[in-house]
Swiss-Prot record:
Family: Belongs to the Smg family.
Protein name per UniProt: Protein Smg homolog
NCBIfam families: PRK03430.1
InterPro entries linked to this entry: Smg
Species: Pseudoalteromonas translucida (strain TAC 125)
Length: 157
């Protein structure tokens, strides 16, 4: 599923090319690109759920963000994300690329990938996908792209 998400992000979402494409046409394109239909449907569902997160009033982690809160990772999350990944999540929050709300959106989408382990590179892409889905997060997206492509730039200033 992650490969389908990456393909969609790189070819449609990131450059706004897929904003008006019909779902059947998109599915056909992905099938022609060699993706499995079940994985395509999982990826499209993943993206739909991501879009729903920003409009959800039923998820308590989307209601408020307080700088006094501290994130404790569950045992399952610690197995899924190694120390390097957990430190990266704290780092991007500390430098203002994400906040508590977007961090929890990232955690939700990571869990939905249904992978037992998520590496740092995949984590970075999921963070970018989440940020890209949030209106007004253009600066955060640019900063995250710099982190993905190892161009620190002005992040630490």
């Amino acid at each position: 599923m992650f490969e389908v998400l990456m393909y969609l992000f790189e070819n449609y979402i990131h450059n706004d090319a897929g904003l008006f494409i019909e779902p059947n046409e998109l599915t056909d394109e992905l099938l022609r690109a060699g993706f499995n239909q079940a994985e395509i449907f999982k990826a499209l569902d993943w993206l739909e759920q991501l879009a729903e997160l920003q409009h959800s009033d039923t998820s308590p982690y989307l209601i408020t963000d307080s700088p006094q809160t501290m994130r404790i990772f569950t045992d399952h999350e610690c197995k899924m994300l190694d120390v390097q990944c957990r430190n990266f999540l704290m780092f991007v929050e500390r430098i203002g690329v994400t906040n508590g709300i977007t961090r929890e959106m990232v955690m939700d989408r990571l869990a939905a990938l249904d992978k037992s382990f998520i590496g740092l590179d995949d984590l970075k892409w999921v963070v970018l996908m989440v940020l890209f889905n949030i209106p007004g997060a253009e600066v955060a997206c640019e900063q995250m792209e710099d982190l993905i492509f190892d161009q620190p730039g002005d992040l630490l200033h």
